[in-house]
């Protein structure tokens, strides 16, 4: 079995709704394989929501005008297609827009139902004069990719309902590039950089996570053909390897005082991993192991980024004053040997 170093994935937030993701190191050639798959999935297969049809009060079709409204129906539809919306409902839901003139109609005038949110309320939809009135019923559905107005048109559509083009994808733009990166003495490994820009309906981080989940599910179909087939196995991450090394350290490397060291050895604690598996209460049950020794152990473990089983991970040794003075207590010999 070939074992490859586990790549790391980091996110750099470039701007609102735009992030840059770096995956490295990848085996030679896998940068383009993974980059192209991620890009196509992000642009075409991330679930989203969009307006699929509208009904305007007093309007029978899109090739007409609304009395008292500056824009014709075609212009209004073009503006409505730019509404960024998210929906938690699997079934179609209806939003309502009602505006009495005079004034500018924006997406903020839309009243969405529970589970639906409009993310660009400043979007201009129409302009109504003093005597004008605009009432619109907007149907919102969930889907993926792009669906044309013709596809949204139902055979039993009620009179006056106008289908619109639906852009479900919440991802606006995805670019990627592959650079060379070094692993020990080799310089031919791939470094994949993916730049993702999304609509306010989803964060780039969630979009990438969704794309990854989709790809895993699809590639899993190929794996099921033969689960015993040989492939490249991903090894532990550098962080996991460093943690394992720290846990394997002998307690001698903690440079504890003689009292604390002898108490732990008598208890059969020889490695750091065995020490962090104990709670403060467990250690206090050890003969001659007191509060000062507990504080000393916590300080030494904190230097490695570790802690006892029931201690907070953010223990700060700098906040501890006079934890221990390093000197032997007057009754040290009696405690150790009697």
UniProtKB/Swiss-Prot annotation:
| Encoding gene, per UniProt annotation | rpoA
Relate the assembly described in the record: Homodimer. The RNAP catalytic core consists of 2 alpha, 1 beta, 1 beta' and 1 omega subunit. When a sigma factor is associated with the core the holoenzyme is formed, which can initiate transcription.
Q: What class of enzyme is it?
A: transferase
Physiological role: DNA-dependent RNA polymerase catalyzes the transcription of DNA into RNA using the four ribonucleoside triphosphates as substrates.
* Name by which UniProt lists this protein: DNA-directed RNA polymerase subunit alpha
Pfam families reported for this sequence: RNA_pol_A_bac, RNA_pol_A_CTD, RNA_pol_L
Residue stretches in coiled coil = none
Keywords in alphabetical order, please: DNA-directed RNA polymerase, Nucleotidyltransferase, Transcription, Transferase
Q: Which NCBIfam families match?
A: PRK05182.1-2, PRK05182.1-4, PRK05182.2-5, rpoA
Q: Which HAMAP family match?
A: RNApol_bact_RpoA (MF_00059)
UniProt comment concerning the protein's domains:
The N-terminal domain is essential for RNAP assembly and basal transcription, whereas the C-terminal domain is involved in interaction with transcriptional regulators and with upstream promoter elements.
């Amino acid at each position: 079995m070939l074992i490859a170093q586990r790549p790391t994935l980091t996110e750099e937030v470039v701007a609102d709704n735009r992030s840059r993701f770096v995956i490295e190191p990848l085996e030679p050639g896998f940068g383009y394989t993974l980059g192209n798959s991620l890009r196509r999935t992000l642009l075409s297969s991330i679930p989203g929501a969009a307006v699929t049809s509208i009904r305007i009060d007093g309007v029978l079709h899109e090739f007409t005008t609304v009395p008292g409204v500056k824009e014709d129906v075609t212009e209004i539809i073009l503006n409505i297609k730019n509404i960024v919306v998210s929906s938690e409902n699997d079934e179609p839901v209806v939003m309502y827009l009602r505006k009495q003139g005079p004034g500018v109609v924006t997406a903020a005038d839309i009243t969405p139902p529970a589970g639906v949110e409009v993310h660009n309320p400043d979007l201009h939809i129409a302009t109504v004069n003093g005597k004008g009135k605009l009432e619109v019923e907007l149907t919102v559905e969930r889907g993926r990719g792009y669906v044309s107005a013709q596809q949204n048109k139902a055979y039993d559509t009620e009179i006056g309902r106008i289908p619109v083009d639906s852009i479900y994808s919440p991802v606006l733009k995805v670019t990627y590039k592959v650079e060379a990166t070094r692993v020990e003495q080799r310089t031919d490994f791939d470094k994949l950089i993916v730049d993702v820009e999304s609509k306010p309906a989803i964060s780039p981080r969630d979009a990438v996570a969704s794309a990854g989940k989709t790809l895993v599910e699809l590639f899993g179909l190929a794996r099921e053909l033969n689960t015993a087939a040989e492939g490249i196995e991903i090894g532990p991450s550098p962080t996991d390897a460093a943690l394992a090394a720290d846990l394997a350290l002998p307690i001698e490397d903690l440079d504890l005082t003689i009292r604390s060291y002898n108490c732990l050895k008598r208890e059969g604690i020889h490695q750091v991993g065995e020490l962090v598996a104990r709670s403060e209460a467990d250690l206090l049950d050890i003969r001659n192991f007191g509060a000062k020794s507990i504080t000393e152990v916590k300080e030494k473990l904190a230097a490695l980024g570790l802690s006892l089983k029931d201690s907070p991970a953010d223990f700060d040794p700098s906040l501890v004053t006079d934890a221990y003075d390093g000197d032997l207590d007057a009754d040290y010999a009696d405690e150790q040997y009697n």
